[in-house]
Amino acid sequence: MSTFNRIHLVVLDSVGIGAAPDANNFSNAGVPDGASDTLGHISKTVGLNVPNMAKIGLGNIPRDTPLKTVPAENHPTGYVTKLEEVSLGKDTMTGHWEIMGLNITEPFDTFWNGFPEEIISKIEKFSGRKVIREANKPYSGTAVIDDFGPRQMETGELIIYTSADPVLQIAAHEDVIPLDELYRICEYARSITLERPALLGRIIARPYVGKPRNFTRTANRHDYALSPFAPTVLNKLADAGVSTYAVGKINDIFNGSGITNDMGHNKSNSHGVDTLIKTMGLSAFTKGFSFTNLVDFDALYGHRRNAHGYRDCLHEFDERLPEIIAAMKVDDLLLITADHGNDPTYAGTDHTREYVPLLAYSPSFTGNGVLPVGHYADISATIADNFGVDTAMIGESFLDKLI
């Protein structure tokens, strides 16, 4: 059995690898998710060239149909498989929480027709600002500011919208509604959405800048999540004195629970990789766990159904992967996975219920291969097993298979 001093987990947000067994219980624009396949459809429709992930074994992951442009390796450098989600949801928070060892048996509340008047009126009363009612529905984050940003600049009204996820999002032009005011309003919205019938996973502050027809969302986004309902492996590690480092929106997703070092938000995937590499180089980081989320795949290309952009984003990450590997120590373990799918060729604009890939690499490996198909929480079980903390949670460790 290998024991690693450091484990680095990188979540490629929404990079699914084929419909999950229960995918037809989920849908997009009325179309069941049963034919979704993020990586497969990208590879088939626009081509996919990711030689560095392929070298680890991406093309060796078991599939009914091999990835068209990602060949299997005869001698991969790592271990690979695909993982199934058991929780009742396909959103970011559910996926990440399950990866860290929780099973979400009751999904969060979603509002396909917008938020009820009771919630909107409370926010208006608290903020002293009106809410643009026409925006109160599932909306693309970029489209909603294109459509209502000019009006907000004139009136100072709030743009409140949702998505297929259990989220309430408030968009505000930074020159009209200052950040501290936006954050204060979001904190209030969080306080009134903590229980059913409005149990939301996240409240998201969505600041933006610019002029009409040229608005840009800024890096001052802030997520107000729920704390996990039970201890995750992050808490187990922190309680045992094992350092945990969060890169990107990980700290927000877990509401800071179990995070000992928040390395900040990412401005882009590339910036997130820079931050991860910087984190790996910290002199104090001799033992512990880093957890990185790279969200551009999902936020910029999956929801917008932009297969070419999604492919290019995967290419960009793959080009940076050797830098991550170069920053590893011999007793490090790198795990690359995803939290759900978001097939850019599929119906609708929502996430897709898919298996996610798992790639495992360490400079210390003497073997390679395909691991049994598992579940998201196998990752948390493996991390717990490696650091010798309580594993009384869902998931099965694959640590003893990494040689």
Swiss-Prot record:
UniProt enzyme class: isomerase
GO molecular function: magnesium ion binding; manganese ion binding; phosphopentomutase activity
Keyword Isomerase attributed: yes
Cofactors required: Mn(2+)
Pathway of action: Carbohydrate degradation; 2-deoxy-D-ribose 1-phosphate degradation; D-glyceraldehyde 3-phosphate and acetaldehyde from 2-deoxy-alpha-D-ribose 1-phosphate: step 1/2
Localization in the cell: Cytoplasm
GO BP, sorted A to Z: 2-deoxyribose 1-phosphate catabolic process; 5-phosphoribose 1-diphosphate biosynthetic process; metabolic compound salvage; nucleotide metabolic process
SUPFAM superfamilies: Alkaline phosphatase-like, DeoB insert domain-like
CDD domains documented for this protein: PPM (cd16009)
UniProt EC number: 5.4.2.7
Binding site for Mn(2+) 2: D298, H303, H351
Highest taxon of source: Bacteria
Record flagged with keyword Repeat: no
Cofactor note: Binds 2 manganese ions.
Residues annotated to bind Mn(2+) 1: D13, D339, H340
GO cellular component terms, semicolon-separated: cytosol
Main location: cytoplasm
Signal peptide: none
Catalytic activity: 2-deoxy-alpha-D-ribose 1-phosphate = 2-deoxy-D-ribose 5-phosphate; alpha-D-ribose 1-phosphate = D-ribose 5-phosphate
UniProt keyword annotations, A-Z: Cytoplasm, Isomerase, Manganese, Metal-binding
UniProt-listed InterPro entries: Alkaline_phosphatase_core_sf, DeoB, Metalloenzyme, Phosphopentomutase_DeoB_cap_sf
NCBIfam families: deoB (TIGR01696), PRK05362.1 (NF003766)
UniProt record similarity statement: Belongs to the phosphopentomutase family.
PANTHER family found in the cross-reference section: PHOSPHOPENTOMUTASE
Function: Isomerase that catalyzes the conversion of deoxy-ribose 1-phosphate (dRib-1-P) and ribose 1-phosphate (Rib-1-P) to deoxy-ribose 5-phosphate (dRib-5-P) and ribose 5-phosphate (Rib-5-P), respectively.
Name recorded for this polypeptide: Phosphopentomutase
